[in-house]
Amino acid sequence: MARIGDNPIPFGDEVTVSVDDHNVVTIEGPKGTLTEQIDPEMTLDIADDHVVVRRPTNQKRHRSLHGLSRSLIVNMVEGVTEGYKKELKIIGVGYRAQMSDETLEIALGYSHPIYFLPPSDVAVSVDSDRGQDDIIIVEGIDKELVGQVAAKIRSLRPPEPYKGKGVRYVDEHVPLKAGKTAAR
């Protein structure tokens, strides 16, 4: 097994980590501040340059929460220092995206345009300069929220399996099916 929870979580000088009495972890960095409630049964030891998560017993529940707690804190540290970014590509004739103020306006082959207002913690932009397909860029410091917003945009028109038209992640491979063949 990986035993990922036993590894210490390093953080740099620009990051400050604090924990209150209810196991609410607050991490501040150059890009912002994130707060997360960690399971109260886990204990957190904060040193000068790292955090260690400890579990009370070796029960299955505690082992799983141990790794989860560590992963959540690692994602928070990475978010406040580097941030997260997801890119989506819009493929299809007449499929377009553009920003109007804070709202993302997308034409995806429906009879009406779709207006998507992202949460305030996430920045959404459109890059139309990379060839013929528009690219939607979702950025933020909260990994879960960035992934959730990107998945919601993708779900507006998922790639269809015959021509691959729709919204997909830039690095996503969509396997295409063969069409019908004529009878002989």
UniProtKB/Swiss-Prot annotation:
Q: Which domain of life is it from?
A: Bacteria
Q: Which Pfam families match?
A: Ribosomal_L6
Gene3D superfamilies, per this entry? Ribosomal protein L6, alpha-beta domain
Q: Which SUPFAM superfamilies match?
A: Ribosomal protein L6
GO annotations of cellular component type: cytosolic large ribosomal subunit
Matches recorded under HAMAP family:
Ribosomal_uL6_B (MF_01365_B)
PANTHER family, alphabetically? 60S/50S RIBOSOMAL PROTEIN L6/L9 (PTHR11655), LARGE RIBOSOMAL SUBUNIT PROTEIN UL6M (PTHR11655:SF14)
**Protein family according to the UniProt entry:** Belongs to the universal ribosomal protein uL6 family.
What does the protein in this record do? This protein binds to the 23S rRNA, and is important in its secondary structure. It is located near the subunit interface in the base of the L7/L12 stalk, and near the tRNA binding site of the peptidyltransferase center.
User: What is annotated about its quaternary structure and interactions?
Assistant: Part of the 50S ribosomal subunit.
Task: Name it.
Answer: Large ribosomal subunit protein uL6
Species assigned in the record: Salinibacter ruber (strain DSM 13855 / M31)
